[in-house]
């Protein structure tokens, strides 16, 4: 199996190197990842500037390329320029810190996987729960096991798996659960400061809110030391609300 | 009604000024938009750098603020810092060029509206179909009419409306249709060039693919000179596939 690996923490981040080394024991791995950290870039792509691609001279069992862009850029270039064909699987990660609830829309890691899904490649995003104490070895070992058990070819087009792994030693992981993207979100606030020339600037801060009644909420699996596996798609239509609107509004003519 | 207006083309773009001027005839409008163009930034937010907020000294019927960040940053700062409370409505646009099909995941304009939806504000993204010949007056006039007819307070939490308006004179618009985010996407390719110091760089290009069998596909309404109105949510779980996975895999224990 040929696996394309990307991330949003940058090409030299500990998480991606741990993942690529672990996968390369069994699979052919190619890393194509951002030159610089791209956390929280969402599904940004680079249209107004060109992209530089560089093969790194690093002594590993796999090839490593850096791209002067975002995770989604890396996936596009990885497929079209580096590999010249679709890989059998794309994995984006291992992210430093979790991607649960509304994180999914901000996350560069998740967007890397969704870009693979758009391109028609079975794709997985993987994150280690704790930003302060990520345990990449646990997540990498889990992914290796998961690929034995889960038929990634069954993942439908335009859909990816969003996997979050508790930051605990591997032998404390109880297993994995199929979960749903939860309503976990942030209550934002801004810390105001004054720069040396008198201008106001602001740091974005946020408090996590976890109050989703759904027993399948992604964060609840993690709290019990299970890995959460959420299938997510690039189609955002709210079907239930669309149906209600259709009942209320016919197609409307103007005038 | 208090309306917060943002966009991704930047605070001085023609589209946002046309929208804000039109809306300010009837509503209290505050513009909080990116200092510089942020097209295709997706749902990026600025976490590693602070944000600068500046009130512009521009002679209009409404206040204009610029933020040194993304559309999602603008919405967060617009609510928490500029207004200090939730507006009654958020509108992101008018974008130069359409946001149909998979554009939705790349679009800064759409992300602005989804950020409003996360914050619990009724939110709308609006785009003029043509990048080359956008017709902002048509889109702005349509939005004014639409707000008379559509109860924005009925939009559920975590959901926004993604509106695309054909680039034709207003009297050629036939009406509006409720639509679904389509499978419209791009077949990417990269044009390789060599920089003056001998390095390779690449321009991302793409050919549009429109082959969605769904009669409610967003782009089909536009082709018939209807405005497309697609309700989209920030929850990406693929429910159908989740159900199939649940039938196949029980919650899995390791060891």
Curated annotation (Swiss-Prot), chains A, B:
Location in the cell: Cytoplasm
Known cofactor(s): a divalent metal cation
Any one Pfam family here would be SurE
This entry's Enzyme Commission designation comes to: 3.1.3.5
Q: Could you say which residues bind a divalent metal cation here?
A: 8-9, 39, 95
Q: What one GO molecular function would you report for this record? A: metal ion binding
- Kindly state which reaction or reactions the protein catalyses: a ribonucleoside 5'-phosphate + H2O = a ribonucleoside + phosphate
Q: What class of enzyme is it?
A: hydrolase
Q: Which family does it belong to?
A: Belongs to the SurE nucleotidase family.
Q: What is this protein called?
A: 5'-nucleotidase SurE
């Amino acid at each position: 199996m040929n696996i394309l690996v990307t991330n949003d923490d940058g090409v030299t981040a500990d998480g991606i190197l741990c993942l690529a080394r672990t996968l390369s024991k069994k699979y052919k791995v190619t890393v194509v990842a951002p030159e610089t950290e791209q956390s929280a870039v969402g599904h940004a792509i680079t249209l107004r500037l060109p992209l530089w691609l560089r093969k790194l001279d690093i002594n590993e069992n796999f090839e490593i390329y850096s791209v002067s862009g975002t995770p989604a850029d890396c996936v596009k270039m990885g497929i079209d320029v580096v590999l010249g064909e679709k890989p059998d699987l794309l994995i984006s990660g291992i992210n430093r810190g979790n991607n649960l609830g509304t994180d999914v829309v901000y996350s560069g890691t998740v967007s890397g996987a969704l870009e693979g899904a758009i391109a028609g490649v079975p794709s997985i995003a993987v994150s280690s729960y704790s930003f302060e104490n990520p345990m990449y070895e646990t997540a990498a070992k889990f992914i290796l096991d998961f690929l034995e058990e889960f038929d990634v070819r069954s993942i439908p087009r335009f859909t990816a798996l969003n996997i979050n792994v508790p930051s605990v030693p591997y032998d404390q992981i109880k297993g994995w659960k199929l979960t749903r993207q939860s309503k976990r979100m942030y209550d934002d606030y801004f810390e105001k400061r004054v720069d040396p020339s008198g201008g106001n600037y602001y740091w974005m801060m946020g408090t996590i809110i976890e109050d989703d009644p759904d027993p399948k909420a992604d964060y609840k699996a993690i709290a019990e030391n299970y890995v959460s596996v959420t299938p997510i798609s690039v189609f955002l239509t709210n079907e239930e609300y669309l149906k209600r609107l259709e009942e209320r509004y016919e197609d409307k003519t103007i005038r």
